Amino acid sequence: MARFVLWGTYCSDALEKRTPYREEHLSRLKSLKQDGILITLGPTEGSTHVFGIFEAETLSVVQQLVAEDVYWREGIWTAINVYPWIQAF
């Protein structure tokens, strides 16, 4: 399995706008974490950006996971980039 880094941005007023979708989002993340796919994910201080690390077979798998997330579908995340990552330490 390869590791991938996710970096993205939140919409303005994300803390308020995410409220109706937060439970679905967190439930899905918990499932991905239990399955060993999600290593970590969370906002930067101020909730302007999101950072995550995933473990998956391919880049396209992670991109599909992002596309299926309610935060992406509802515009809470406004831009997401996923990069293959080589963990040195």
Regions of interest found by a model, annotated:
Residues M1-F89:
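Conserved, structured core segments of small domains
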